[in-house]
Design a protein with these regions (language model features):
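Electrostatic, structured charged patches in enzyme active sites and in nucleic-acid/phosphate-binding
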Residues: 1-145
Length: 145
């Protein structure tokens, strides 16, 4: 993989997740740290808590060795009041794109636990992103072909 140059505004969860990706590069074809705004970055539409349409920019787009594409937005518990709406819009997007393009997509809001060494996401709709019981653990080794 090519070197990654981080912007100074990278959050701690983003830094820690990036380290996980770098440690597991044998399981990953490529990954992209998405920007936070602008038409040059990947986003999906979601309806905010104020009922207005907004753009949601996931933090990471990852292609695993087995072809799975991961769309993750790193968070810590309680860090984003819009998290549920963003997550559920991303689940909708992944379902539609998986069927339309015959892709294996996983992703969602990704919560770092255990000092940001254990990363959990829900493959289904959620009504609370602060309770991760029952969520899947993202293990890059599971996608290594």
């Amino acid at each position: 993989m090519q070197p990654f140059f981080a912007l100074n505004r990278e959050s701690n969860p983003e830094q820690q997740f990036r380290l996980l990706l770098e440690e597991n590069d044998d399981c990953i074809d490529w990954w992209y740290k998405n920007g936070d705004s602008g038409k040059d970055n990947f986003s999906i539409a979601y309806t905010g808590i104020d009922k207005k349409q907004k753009a949601f920019y996931v933090d990471f787009v990852i292609r695993m060795k087995d072809g799975t594409i991961c769309l993750f937005d790193t968070k810590t518990n309680g860090s984003d009041p819009e998290g549920v709406n963003k997550h559920n819009a991303l689940v909708d997007y992944m379902k539609k794109e998986s069927e339309k393009r015959n892709l294996k997509l996983i992703g969602g809001i990704l919560i770092g636990e255990d000092k940001l060494t254990n990363w959990k996401y829900s493959p289904t709709y959620v009504d609370n992103i602060n309770d991760t019981s029952g969520w899947d653990v993202f293990n890059p080794k599971a996608y290594s072909e």
